[in-house]
Every structure is written in structure tokens, then in C-alpha cells.
Amino acid sequence: MNEFAERIERDFPVRRKEKEKVDFRTWLVYTLKELGYSPKLESGTSALSAGGNVTNVVVGDIEKAKIVLAAHYDTGVREVLPPLICPTRPATYMLYEALIPLLALAVSFLISFGVTFALNMPNMTLPLFLLLLVVTLFYPKYGKSETNNKNANTSGVIALLEVAKALTPRYRGEVCFLFLDGGTQGSKGASRLIHAHPELKKKSVVVLDCVGEGDELLILPGKASRWNDKLLDTILEQFSNSERKTCFLKTDGLVHYPSDNHAFMGGTVICACKKVKGFGRCILPRKTEEIDEENLSLLCDGLCKLVMYYNPQNT
């Protein structure tokens, strides 16, 4: 197992509550310093549902970096239904997500109807139904934490650490690494950084999310990045396939990936997918048993070359 993956899975598998994240950040900062970097903590006033405020870990100079690599390190609440992401089939993903509130409505109604029917109190059905709905609103804050976070998004953090480790001192000043907080809560960490560093709006930001399992590394440029010919050409030239894995840059069609990439104007997201009949390219984070080291190797190699050869001045 990858050395970073082993340590994180052993000591910091859940990073949702404030103490869990503080412990992880302490290790992360120490590890980055051991690799020769000077990480900084940047905190904001945005409150998080599980307590504490947004705290990002920034490695490098955002203003001087020619490219930014990012991944969120926080983990979320355990969803009622197994998480499913279909990047190239947005309608399928949104319909699946819509099942959660519908399920909450159905369960709340059945419980309220069953209880009031058994007690012969039909007038209390609606009040109890509404009360149960209010209770479900507090689930994101008080619900059980997701425990299997290998793919979402321990894999993205590990990939960043592998790139940081592999880069020679000559190229380290040309990249900025962002370890983002609040990724599971509307990209609060990314939004905080953009507010503090407006120059991020002009940067090419590559976000890594759910890269730990899948036969295809799917690269999805955002609306602005689709017109960045230099970035796309460099990705095509520097990312390579292996015997079992492919890297696919998708620049056409309707796509949607629910991560921090949407916060950045020049955002591009990289994820790892497997093809599931009826759903197309899919990511099933909860089913991941182990992070695929071949994925990490391909990503690390491609991203290191991207840092070395990408020249935004020519765009």
C-alpha cells in the first residue's frame, strides 16, 4: 500500500469534525515540511456544519504559480443512499440525488401515518409528519460520519502528496498545492480562497477527486478551460495510458462533476471512472476497498509533466 495512504487510513480515516481535521492537518503540515515545502494554514469565518471554521492548507505562492493543483481533504456525512456520480450523464446523477429528499418524504409520511393510526390520533398525522421532516434537516450536522473515504477524497490528497514528493526543486516554485476544507459542504474552502486570493480566478486549477478506483482517468475541463488550448494540448501530450488504464480528455458534450472544480473559473477536474451498464461512466466511492496504485502512478507522472511543460503565457 502507498505510504501516504497507509498512514491516512490508519490514523485519519475520517476528517469531518474539527478535532479530526486538526489532527490530520498537523500531520499534513509536518509531512509537507519533511518533503521540503513551507505549507501555510489559511482560515476563514465560514462555519461548517460539523463544527469549526474553514481551514485550507496552501503550499506555494498562488500569485506566482503557473498552475494550481487542488483536492479537498475533508470527509462528509454518511449518505442514506450509496453515493453515485455519473460525470457524463448529469441527468442520471440528478435523478439519483432527487431520490434522497423523496425517500425522506416517504419515510416521514409512513412513520407519522403508522404511529397516529396505531394511537387512533389522525389529527396528529400532519404535525408529526412536519416534525419528522424538520428532524431530517439536522442530519447533515448530527448524522453518522462516512467511514469509507478511500476514494472520496483520500485518493486526491494522496495524489497531491505524490506529485509534491516527485517534483524536483527546479519546478516546485511553478506550482501551488491547495488542500481544501469544506469540499463536502458546497466547496466552502475553495470559495474562501478565491475571496482571499482573487488572482485564482485567472489561474488554471486542476482538481483531483475520486481518483482511487477505476479503469479510466477522466479529465473534464470546465467551460473556460475548454478554450484554453495550451492547457488542453499539454494534457494531451503529457498524460499517457498504460496497459490496463486509459486517460481520456473529454471536451465535448454535457458533463457535470459535483466538486470544487465549479468554484474555480479555470477549473478542470480529474476523476477515475468505471463503466457500468445503464449508467455509463460511474464512480461508486463507498465500494472502494483499496486505492489503485497504478492510478496514482499515472496521475503523478502526468501532473508532474504538466507542471514542467505548461506555459500559460502562450495562451
Report the location of each language-model feature:
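Acidic/histidine-rich catalytic neighborhood of metal-dependent amide-processing enzymes
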Residues: F113-K230, G253, D260-N261
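N-terminal capping segment at the start of a domain
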Residues: M1-D23, V29-T31, L35, L48, ...
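A non-catalytic alpha/beta surface segment that caps or lines the substrate-entry region
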Residues: P13-E63, V80-T116
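A structural signal for isolated positions on well-ordered beta-strands in alpha/beta enzyme cores
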Residues: K40, V68, C176-L178
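Active-site-adjacent substrate-binding region
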Residues: E34, T45, G214-T315
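Short glycine/serine- and small hydrophobic-enriched flexible loop segments
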Residues: Y30, L161-T168, K305-M308
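Solvent-exposed loop/turn segments at secondary-structure junctions
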Residues: A47, Y73-G76, G182-Q185, C210-G214, ...
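Extended, hydrophilic extramembrane loops/domains of integral membrane proteins
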Residues: K66-L81
